[in-house]
Amino acid sequence: MIRSTKVMGVLNITPDSFSDGGEHCQPNRALKTAQRLAKQGAHIIDIGAQSTRPGAELLAPEQELKRLLPALLLICQARQEGELPADLLLSLDTFHAPVAAKALELGVNWINDVSAGTADGAMLPLVAKAGCPYVLMHRRGSSQTMANFCNYNDVVSDVIAELQQRSAAALNAGIKREQMWWDPGLGFAKTTSQNLALLEGLPQLAAHGYPLLVGPSRKRFIGEILKENRAKARSWGTAAAVCKAIAGGAAMVRVHDVASMRQICQMADALWPNEIA
C-alpha cells in the first residue's frame, strides 16, 4: 500500500480567528478560497464559523448558523454544479449539534468537534445517526479557560487516556469505531513543550488504531519557538511540524497553506512510507 497523507484545508468564516480572521466572512470570498484550496490539492476543506483560539467569543448555535449558512450554502451549491470537484469532501468545525445537523442536511461530509462531544450532549447521537466521519479532538476546558488546564502527569499518556474516554462515550452513543478520528489537539490546553512532546509521542496515539488528524498549522507554539508573532510567517515551522506528524503516523494534516504543505506531505510520504496510521 502506497502511503498518501491527506490534506485538510482550513476555511475560517470568522472575524476573530488567530490566523486569518475576517478574510472569508463574505460568502463569495469564502467560495473563492474553497476553490483555491481545492485546486491546490486539498482532499477535504474544514469550514468553521466559531473561532476556537484562546479567549475567543463563544457563539450560540443560532449565531453560528447565521454566520455560517450564507457561505456554506454557496459552497455546497458550487460543488453540486461542478464549480468545485465532485469528490471534494467538506468538513464542519463545530461543537454545536444543531449547527452540525443543518450542515449535514446541506451535504457536509465530516464533523470536526474540538470538544469531542463534551460541549453538546446531542452531538454524539446525531453523528451516530448520520454515520459520518467524526473527529474527536483533545482539549481541556473551553477557549476561555483552557490555559488553566495544562497540568498533565504525562501529556502523551493523559491525552491518550482522555481520548479513549471520549471514544468510549462515542461508541456507547452508537458511533462506529470506523467513523472516528483522533486529533491530539495541538495548542489546546498545552504548553509549547507539551505540544512538542505530543508530536514526539504520536506513534503511541497511532498504536490505538484510530486514524490521526494533526493540526499544527501556524500555531502559537511554533511562533514561540521561532520568535515569530505573525501567524502567516510561520509556514516553515509548520512544514517541520507536518513532517514530524507524518513521521509519527498522521493520516491527515490540517493546514492553511495547502499548496506548499501538499508537496511536503508527498515528500514525507516517500521518506516515511511505512508509518501509516
Regions found by a protein language model. Give the residues of each.
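Active-site-adjacent loop and "lid" segments of alpha/beta metabolic enzymes
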Residues: 2, 15-36, 52-90, 94-98, ...
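N-terminal glycine-rich anion-binding loops that anchor highly charged ligand groups
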Residues: 4-9, 35-49
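N-terminal substrate-binding region of glycoside hydrolase catalytic domains
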Residues: 12
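Short acidic capping loops at alpha-helix termini that bridge into adjacent secondary structure
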Residues: 87-88, 176-179
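Conserved C-terminal portion of the radical SAM core fold
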Residues: 173
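Acidic helix/loop microenvironments that form the catalytic cleft of cell-wall polysaccharide enzymes
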Residues: 186
